[in-house]
Amino acid sequence: MVIFWKIIGMDCAAAKPVSCSVKRNHDVKYVSTVYDFVTRGLFVLARAQVDYFFDKNGKMTVSASLKKVCPLTDQLPRFGVHAELKSEFENVEYYGRGPLENYSDFKEHSPVGIYKTTVTNMAHKYIKPQDSGNRGEVRYSVVTNQNGAGLRFNALEKYINFNANHFTLEQLKKAGHIEDLPDCDTTFTAIDGFVRGTGSGSCGPIPSREHLISFGYFKPLCFSFEVEPVEDQDKE
């Protein structure tokens, strides 16, 4: 399946802006964006709409949806929103499955609870660098610096998946060995509404149907979450 993703160019698809509109209603500002995900050959795979609602208290609500355009995009590895912070945002607290990485078909070892860790320790250090460290069924997650300032991500209609690393997915893809993976001046956070199951790994069958991510022309993937600031604990 990974080879199939590469064949159709899903692993290197880029977001091409289609439209952007801004509205204001009393104390709430609304920004709506539409993107096409295209391959290097400008072949459109899917269309995404991401809406942002900002209130006067600094809280942002994000609503994202993805609709199929290409008939080949029957399965996805994940669908979510990423954000980069400075590397000083190292501390993590979350309410979800933990303390180890877990996925929809690989989670019984990780009971639901409130866990504290660091961005450095989120990912599992496999010899061959690969996507890892996902935390599933997350109700909320908080990323802060040493002073306690940062961001809190709250699930809304359904649970979210959360991950954070000091490297980007592009750097992960290029690294051949764990020692090739740079420790960058960034905290790369991932808020995913949908994450594919692991199946039996690279040498076994793909996940069963209930752990795959399927979507269609008239049945888009949809999820939403909130982002709110966490104030510096030393601030008077």
Task: Provide a role label for each language-model segment.
Residues 1-236:
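Beta-strand/loop-rich accessory regions of lumenal/periplasmic or secreted enzymes
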